[in-house]
Amino acid sequence: MLDVFSRKIVGWAMETHLETTLVEQALRMALAQRQPGLGELLHHSDRGGQYASKTYQQLLAAFGIIVSMSRSADPYDNALMESCIGTLKTECADHRFPSRQVARSELFAYLEGWYNRRRLHSALGYLSPEQFEHQFLEDKLSLHSKG
């Protein structure tokens, strides 16, 4: 799950399947991390079966999440996530891993240690997602203290 505002990966999961439980795990991680209020989120995805499933749609509804789905066969509708996945494949998953455990460990290190904390994004003024969020909050606090 990608926070479009800061480009931060806020939820992810890794399994040997693409079933609904996979995206449920990622969503629950994102919700635990962000703790949004009801009706404050928009969830955009492609039309994959795991996202369109009744179970997943009910979970989104239970948290008051607004649902948006790409048009069929149009990757440009989900360009930010497609770009993020392309970056992940190029920078982290460009080789075979000796085991799933090693793959999971390397994915965790990449997402949590590199991508969110240190990888610079031109769209964020060459800040990492965490630096961008920190700067945004500092600027917001500064405005409130002046007002």
Locate predicted features:
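Charged DNA-binding/catalytic regions of mobile-element recombinases
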Residues: 1-147
